[in-house]
């Protein structure tokens, strides 16, 4: 999994040298943001399920057909609604991992790779998840550097879905 730390070390190792000043700056930058990233991850751990449920309800309001259409990809049944919350929660959980490592590696490895094919095969609309993630970003209640860390990875996921 790629993180700013592993990338700096890999680059130095590839050259067969110690970390350069630029690589050390990247490492120090991560450590300077680490507290905010860990606080963001804690907020996801404490609130992620609640955020996922609220985001799912937002999706149902924005796209009412998702609760009216029949089929496994829709939320017209309790099972369908549970799947929707589960999928949103998966995005949020993976975003929390990004906050911990300080990079997009978890999203790249666990979500982005094959995302378009996966959604297409299951008949899932990326717009549902974009709306859910935008809702979380706009309503999570985080502030300052903590919000900045969380929003960096929420926006990355939104862009990957777009």
Swiss-Prot record:
Contains one covalently linked bilin chromophore. It comes from Mastigocladus laminosus. The gene is pccA. Heterodimer of an alpha and a beta chain. SUPFAM superfamilies: Globin-like. Disulfide bonds: none annotated. (15Z)-phycoviolobilin binds at residue 84. The keyword Transport applies. It comes from the Bacteria. One of its GO terms (cellular component) is plasma membrane-derived thylakoid membrane. GO terms for biological process: photosynthesis. It holds the Pfam family Phycobilisome. It is a peripheral membrane protein. Light-harvesting photosynthetic bile pigment-protein from the phycobiliprotein complex. CDD domains: PC-PEC_alpha. This is Phycoerythrocyanin alpha chain.
């Amino acid at each position: 999994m790629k993180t700013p730390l592993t990338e700096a070390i890999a680059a130095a190792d590839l050259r067969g040298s110690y970390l350069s000043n630029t690589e050390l700056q990247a490492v120090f930058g991560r450590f300077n943001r680490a507290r905010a990233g860990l606080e963001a991850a804690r907020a996801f751990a404490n609130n992620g399920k609640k955020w996922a449920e609220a985001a799912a309800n937002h999706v149902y309001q924005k796209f009412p057909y998702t609760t009216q259409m029949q089929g496994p990809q829709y939320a017209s049944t309790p099972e369908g609604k549970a799947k929707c919350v589960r999928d949103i929660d998966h995005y949020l959980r993976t975003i929390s991992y990004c906050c911990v490592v300080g990079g997009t590696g978890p999203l790249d490895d666990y979500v982005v790779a094959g995302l378009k094919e996966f959604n297409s095969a299951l008949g899932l609309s990326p717009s549902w998840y974009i709306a859910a993630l935008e809702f979380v970003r706009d309503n999570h209640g985080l502030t300052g550097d903590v919000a900045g860390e969380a929003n960096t990875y929420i926006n990355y996921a939104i862009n990957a879905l777009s």
